[in-house]
Amino acid sequence: MALPTAQPLLGSCGSPICSRSFLLLLLSLGWLPLLQTQTTRTSQEAALLHAVTGTVDFASLPTGLFLGLMCDEVSGLSMGHAKELAMAVRQKNIVLQVHQLRCLARRLPKHLTNEELDALPLDLLLFLNPAMFPGQQACAHFFSLISKANVNVLPRRSLERQRLLTGALKCQGVYGFQVSETDARALGGLACDLPGEFVAKSSEVLLPWLARCGGPLDQGQAKAVREVLRSGRAPYGPPSTWSVSTLDALQGLLVVLDESIVHSIPKDVITEWLQGISREPSRLGSKWTVTHPRFRRDTEQKACPPGKEPNVVDENLIFYQNWELEACVDGTLLAGQMDLVNEIPFTYEQLSIFKHKLDKTYPQGYPESLIKQLGHFFRYVSPEDIRQWNVTSPDTVNTLLKVSKGQKMDAQVIALVACYLRGGGKLDEDIVKALDNIPLSYLCDFSPQDLHAIPSSVMWLVGLHDLDKCSQRHLGILYQKACSAFQNVSGLEYFEKIRTFLGGASREDLRALSQHNVSMDIATFKKLQVDALVGLSVAEVQKLLGPHIGDLKTEEDKSPVRDWLFRQQQKDLDSLGLGLQGGIPNGYLILDFNVREAFSSGAPLLGPGFVFAWIPALLSALRLS
């Protein structure tokens, strides 16, 4: 399972010393009274006490001791010891909490060399005062490290972040509101805090950065972003020219769009984009690729430090910095030890880096040997990723379905099953049972070819509105399967079962159904194929609808009722006594042209106007003959 932050691993010290946290360390430094109670002197305790008489070797201490560090304990350390402690935290890749970092920063010496800064944890530097580094060279080095730190450790608009931003701009030589791409890279995460005046003057540089910022924009930033987008300036141009990829790129800026901007975006673009994110929610604010651009930048600039490349997935990776995970961990190592990836409590951020590494290792999709070992890691895979897979084993499908149960992963599950069917797989009883809690509307998401692999027994589970978004081709295939599934059912029970699938029924099927007085409701009638419906006579439709025949009047101006009316003799419609209009007047010919075959324009089925237009030509031809 994943945890929001790294937690101490139980038993990582190998003795009860971890449960006493940092007390023994403080005792070893000689400024805490001796414990009144006697404790068992383990080898680790002896090492701590030995530190009093010599140089303190913090790097040799167990990781668990650092994780329990308290402010009161740190305040008793000398500045030299505090610096050595901080360096050990960096060396051991230990993740400290905010209050621990702040306390430790207060005890550091006021003068630090570049070499000493390099040896400190990056996130610890966020709590240092930039005034400690006067001069262009010193401040440039300090802020080059800050740009790689996770500034979100500090709350947005906190005094510490404001102090860092002011210092960074001054060090970079920015005195107006214009910043370059180089300036933005130098600021790193601090670029997310630049006020609206900077956004207005440097929109081409800053808007892509703001789109990737994790937190909400402040009022000034949001106003400036809206003005830039409304004006059609770079980098996105006028809203009327936006595409689906533009909306994807906007990401965190979408929330500031106002009504005037939204109305300027082409409607078909909005529709396509909304359909895309409904199928793949991970496209909206995806954290796999854009949330932390600094990780990719760090990887390009830094190689894996000597001795840091792991040969096994273990707890030590928890304490790697994110850039070290990117630089040092190999995708094939992760693929071969997915059981350990799932067992160790990595953070969500670390797991996202692991996924990025796997995606780079297998750009054409994960092999099935890896897929069957994904376990809980399956939760971090998007439907788009799954569509690249080739899954042939029902055991693989069943394993991942168990992992996804209760996790709100319908989109991933549907993509997985579709992938399996595409590879020639068949839905067995276990897979069908695992899909019980997912609405069967997923049948519409499969390709028509995949539907042939669905067992007919599944049709018994389809609900009344499950197929509402299915295409005509889907319905035609599913109707045939439903007929097979319900072949031993008759009467009204048969109609209740087959009703959901009637959108795929042919004219002959509807004609046969009309002989059973099924009393079809108008909602079902409206879902019938137009091509099948228009060939039915008034008497046949009357038998189909039964007591619901009067509902035709409310739908006479809408398809498919309108299409059916155009093909009927008006005198037959009059016999219903409903006042239906639009039929063919008495004495006129009924011409049955197949428009789709005769005309390449794909016009709708013939109405009376089309028929009337041809009658004079036909009469002239008859006179000539």
UniProtKB/Swiss-Prot annotation:
Subcellular location: Cell membrane; Golgi apparatus
Tissue: Specifically expressed in lung. Overexpressed in hereditary renal carcinoma developed by Eker rats.
A GO biological-process term: pancreas development
Secretion signal, residue range per the UniProt entry: 1-35
Record has Ion transport as a keyword: no
Cystine crosslinks: C304-C328
Pro-peptide region(s): 601-625
One Pfam match: Mesothelin
Topology class, membrane: Lipid-anchor; GPI-anchor
Residue positions of covalent lipid attachment, annotated as GPI-anchor amidated serine: S600
Glycosylation sites: N390, N488, N517
Residue(s) carrying Phosphoserine: S202
Primary subcellular site in the record, as a coarse category: membrane
Presence of the UniProt keyword Ribonucleoprotein in the record: no
Protein modification: Proteolytically cleaved by a furin-like convertase to generate megakaryocyte-potentiating factor (MPF), and the cleaved form of mesothelin.
Keywords from the UniProt entry: Cell adhesion, Cell membrane, Cleavage on pair of basic residues, Disulfide bond, Glycoprotein, Golgi apparatus, GPI-anchor, Lipoprotein, Membrane, Phosphoprotein, Secreted, Signal
A GO cellular component entry from the record: plasma membrane
Subunit annotation: Interacts with MUC16.
Function as written in the Swiss-Prot or TrEMBL entry: Membrane-anchored forms may play a role in cellular adhesion.
Family statement: Belongs to the mesothelin family.
Protein name according to UniProt: Mesothelin
